[in-house]
Amino acid sequence: MFRKLLVILLIGLAISCHPKLNPIQQQIQSDINRSEVFKNNFTGLVVYDPVTKDTLVNINGSKYFTPASNTKIVTLYTALTLIPKQIEALRYMTKNDSLFIKGTGDPSFFHPFFKDSTLYFFLKDKSTITLVKGQLDDDHYGPGWAWEDYDAAFSAERSALPIYGNVLEVIHTNGVTQFTPDYFINRSQMTAFSMPRKRANFTNEFYIPLRENDTIQVPFIQSDTLTSRLLSLALNKEVRLMPPQNDVVFDQKLYGMSRDSLLKQMMVVSDNFIAEQLLLNASSTQLNRLNSRDIRRFVLDSLLSDLQQKPRWVDGSGLSRYNLFSPISMVQVLEKIQQNSEHYLEFFPIGGETGTLEHWFNGTDQPYIYAKTGSLGNNFNLSGFLITSSGKTLIFSFMNNHYTQPSSVVKKEMGVVLRRIRDDY
């Protein structure tokens, strides 16, 4: 009898000591468990109230996920913290009548979207210009990037001094074809047929489909020699090349366009090239060298040393499947952005209105989702800020990996969960 009573007491004690889930956690957990869509996914969701410091929902929050372009959230934080409001566009030294220059990774020079000409107007009146080569202390491609994407616009090469966004842009309208830069006209074949590839694998030979009212962007293979040639043609004067020398010290800086304008483009349309180059620019600013690996290590060891789960962070854009982040870590980075930027919502796509969220997660009367998407094959993630019906701003990270159904199905089911959080809290 005594033994039975003891067992009953122990069971009661265990039940009373077991942490109770809050109502929102219980409801969301139930929704996800019952969902046929999430049934075979690897799903993680963390919802956090930055005012009360309460974690409202935590489902697999400490597990690692492939973040895809959610990685750009960490690049955003890095750039906001390390890059000045006007981006450093060039470093240079003047000696007698000669100008020696090196790149800082600034992606804006003649970029197809920005078409920034700060560097052009700085250089056009200089008599003797020498580009010091060998400044990129990194690979042109990130680790784990898919080789088959080499001719895709979203996979442009990284470089020390980008020009034209490191892509050939071909616009065909009303029977007229325009090449930018036109240096590649004689290296391009126009074809009425669809070719397997738009560029040769190891050379800058292009195969451009001839389609009316079409714009095509194809990455070109970067080199210091090509950069000096394109600069020479743009400036209509010779730009020489030389290796680094000890007596050439880059003691002056040229500042270019607004950092925040670049960041908004990176986040809203999920521009991989801008993300990669801003990471290199942060490296130039902080470490005086262009090395993506070194600046990531610096950020993880200093600015993000308090993350609960140390990420595996291998590039600036999220193109690599080697990246691994937990939902909790993503929420922590988002909170840092919120704390350090007064206009933080302006950097994020708006549900139902802009960028990668233009057709998804729209509100009823007004937007309620401001978040970054992250898409790779079989993966879709959404991390950012959720405005509840009661007016509270929550931080969330909703990650879905390893599904086989269409992403549209997963997005719709995520919308059901996010609307419940909006309406119930």
For the regions a protein language model found, what residue spans apply to each?
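Hydrophobic h-region of N-terminal signal peptides that target proteins for export
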Residues: L9-H18
